[in-house]
Amino acid sequence: MSLNSLDLPGKPEDTRVVVAMSGGVDSSVVAGILKREGYDVVGVTLQLYDHGAAVHRAGSCCAGQDIEDARRVSESLGIPHYVLDYEARFREAVIDPFANSYVSGETPIPCVSCNQTVKFADLLQTARDLGADALATGHYIRSRANGAHRALYRPVDTDRDQSYFLFATTQEQIDYLRFPLGHLPKAQVREIAEEMGLTVAKKQDSQDICFVPQGKYSDIISKLKPEAANPGDIVHIDGRTLGRHDGIVHYTVGQRRGIGVATGEPLYVVHLDAANARVIVGPREALETHKVFLRDINWLGDAPISDLPEGGMEVFAKVRSTRPPRPAVLRHADGQTWVELVDGESGIAPGQACVLYSDESNTARVFGGGFIGRSEREPQAEEMLRRLVANTASASAA
């Protein structure tokens, strides 16, 4: 049997596709394209978090106005549209872990957790319950057949590449998901929206983190976890106490501005010692990292990660969403998985993701990745930090 444009058997009219509609231009165009191709399209919008009934905030996702936009687009396309209340689930699976992670001194990525749990787990099950053959989203990433399964690849438009946030997508989810925009540049998507007469054609893009008002992480974390705002010392990596801070929630590894001390030398946050409420700062070279150890790994390679050769596997690693993939070596031994960064990176923080690729091009395959549990700096800085933390632990025990 021949395959349709979604690589599924059967004619489009016999293929039901649930489209995850956020109310933005991307998911709206996905619904429009699939409807135009003759698929049996069903739109579903998740109500995840709202700062006020039907109050739109630029950069939010799935708030009141966004839900109304998704409804209007669905109506104009002539497809059924359902709104599912996932606020409690979103709080449990995304917001609370986000706050807990910050309290422990990490720099979490809530969008990964949202995709991993709510969007690609709960919503996927909803799509199956609706009898859908696939779940389509407006993410900028590509998938294509790889033997009996499907593999992920970077999109054509690398400026919109969302593979960093989708590394935790499981093989089962990848096989069921479809990403119709992966081969299109964003500008063309807007043009298609205009051609279709969609009301959201000129709508501003979301900024992903829907539950953080005006981008102030500290506000919501302080409300959920007041202990994150406990004051403490700002300490130089060489052991000098330089000043005080109003809570580690206001800092992140790699930060330079707004540290709150003036010493005549450029200082950066190099470590958040959550156990002792300390912000540890140092020179830029103290941020340089060449090795990161991963946890909660989602490996999407063809062979098990435990079968990596003794010398490791040459890959390209991305340690921040805004940075390009850089040469690295992936290693696995004695139950540990780590990545050696050939050129080193600065500002790497626990809780961030390290995503692995076959190469640095926009056709690169996504091999998955993991969350950064810890990292190792240049030997001198690493030893200074270990000594500082160890001495504090010994003093506390005494």
UniProtKB/Swiss-Prot annotation:
Reactions catalysed: S-sulfanyl-L-cysteinyl-[protein] + uridine(34) in tRNA + AH2 + ATP = 2-thiouridine(34) in tRNA + L-cysteinyl-[protein] + A + AMP + diphosphate + H(+)
Molecular function via GO: ATP binding; tRNA binding; tRNA-uridine 2-sulfurtransferase activity
Interaction with tRNA: annotated segments: 160-162
Organism lineage string: Bacteria, Pseudomonadati, Pseudomonadota, Alphaproteobacteria, Hyphomicrobiales
Protein known as: tRNA-specific 2-thiouridylase MnmA
Gene3D superfamilies: Adenine nucleotide alpha hydrolases-like domains, HUPs, Translation factors
Biological process (GO), any one: tRNA wobble position uridine thiolation
Family: Belongs to the MnmA/TRMU family.
Enzyme type, top EC level: transferase
Main function: Catalyzes the 2-thiolation of uridine at the wobble position (U34) of tRNA, leading to the formation of s(2)U34.
GO cellular component: cytoplasm
UniProt cross-references to PANTHER family, sorted A to Z: MITOCHONDRIAL TRNA-SPECIFIC 2-THIOURIDYLASE 1, TRNA 5-METHYLAMINOMETHYL-2-THIOURIDYLATE -METHYLTRANSFERASE
Keywords: ATP-binding, Cytoplasm, Disulfide bond, Nucleotide-binding, RNA-binding, Transferase, tRNA processing, tRNA-binding
Main subcellular location of this protein, as a coarse class: cytoplasm
Source organism superkingdom: Bacteria
Active site, per annotation: 114 (nucleophile), 210 (cysteine persulfide intermediate)
Sites marked Interaction with tRNA: 139, 352
Annotated disulfide bonds: 114-210
Subcellular location: Cytoplasm
EC number(s) per entry: 2.8.1.13
Residues noted as binding ATP in the record, renumbered to the chain: 20-27, 46, 138
